[in-house]
């Protein structure tokens, strides 16, 4: 066999190696050509990602408007101050301590904190975000005069601004740094008001440690625009409501207060105010309790404002009628416990209108026991109690109802006078919409429309009916009796001259959240009503938490209703009705049907009715039968009195009434 020579073997090996290297070179050249020609853009982008990163600038959120287009929350561009510590620390002629001393009073940041920021590693650190214009202007002048522009600079950021300050603050909420919504509608509407985070990004170069380099902000992506939201709130009505609430807070020194106004036909919330409150432009100065929207989150015992619901339930269930006469003995027993009237008095023979008008506890306990706990609970659920209304706000409470299987007679009796249950203020408003609206109940809502960036309407929030708890006949009957409560009964201080109003006062002891039971000498005073009763256009609920001194709802909450509703009637352009007087001309016969029921024989203290328009004979006869003294002044019809209507008097007190022919 022929053997290969050593030279031949070496030549073959050399050829093989040469071929191998040529093949590798062809592959490498081909790959390089592919990268340079066909995949160039991808590798450039990858390279840029090693030295650049996305940085969120948080461009403007959408605007929140009231129903009439008034701005409630807007975004404005403001300056934020940053520093390049690496460049600063290379400056031999810059005294950082002196810089801190100069900037500290302007920025309201301690010198120690500033020096700490100046000494950080890297090329970028925030000094102060979202500066006030005056601050930025002063610092800008310093940068130029002190030649600090090499290491200090500004970046524009979006800041939320609330033009009306405290107005509607607990509802709107607020936005913190980094565009983070922290409460209220701002939180609830986050995804609607800010459609895309990418639209608000910028590219920044970074150093070896990943820190952004301060001068490297590149062109931001063009914002696609944001949605805007229109609320059902009317800014003018909101102002009226909050002003009346503030006056009551000052006068009564209450710990807190709530006022809500709603259209009973549509469920649109026209005003919603809370006290305490805060300025969302300076939310950092507030404390935790100031942020709370108690109108939807907190529960309370409604007291006598719940009694019209009980009356409606009994009438609709057929367990009681408007013509039923019941004799009030002043005390009624349930499960071994006595239920008494607020004044410890007895009212004698009374009909349902009297039981409502004079808020007779024994009467409602009697009605509740006749109707039964299971039936009352079923109606309470129909009226929307025990579950959230579903309004477009975060943190809504559900309230508390009895399990009817566990109810004793005392539970039924106390529920019938608005105790031993817990409701939210918004639930009360929703329930009253049924009584004001012919039995039809509407769901409260606060959003009206969501609009696209071009202004076109994206979504409309329609009126939503949530059942008919009672018939139209029953709702109208209760509404008429609630009008008597305002015109003649304990709600006299809610009367709006020229308009017929219906409503109910409420006074309830505060629940002890720690020990259970009730807090001593602490009360919730409230009034809930609507008007004008012929065609209700607004429901208004007023709640005062622990007013000092006088604490009855008819004396401290009803006047807030009166002031607010009076202004609303005029603002809405609803014409006032001519005042109806009881004519004294030729009225030689005393007509008991026209006059409020007399207090019971055993009743020592009671509310004085409104004598406006009564004749001297009518006033004198009523006062005589009530056991009160009479001091008339003038002739004609009564036009003023002392003590005033709705004030508490005792048998034997003298009542001065002035009469005139005008």
Which functions belong to the PLM regions below?
Residues 98-105, 117-226, 542:
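Small/polar-residue-rich segments within soluble enzyme cores
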Residues 51-53, 82-92, 100-104, 121-130, ...:
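Second-shell loop/turn segments in exported
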Residues 3, 8-42:
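Hydrophobic alpha-helical transmembrane signal-anchor segments
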Residues 213-257:
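Conserved, well-ordered alpha-helix/loop/beta-strand core segments that scaffold catalytic motifs
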Residues 11, 73, 207-220, 259-304, ...:
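Beta-lactam-recognizing serine transpeptidase/beta-lactamase-like catalytic domain environment
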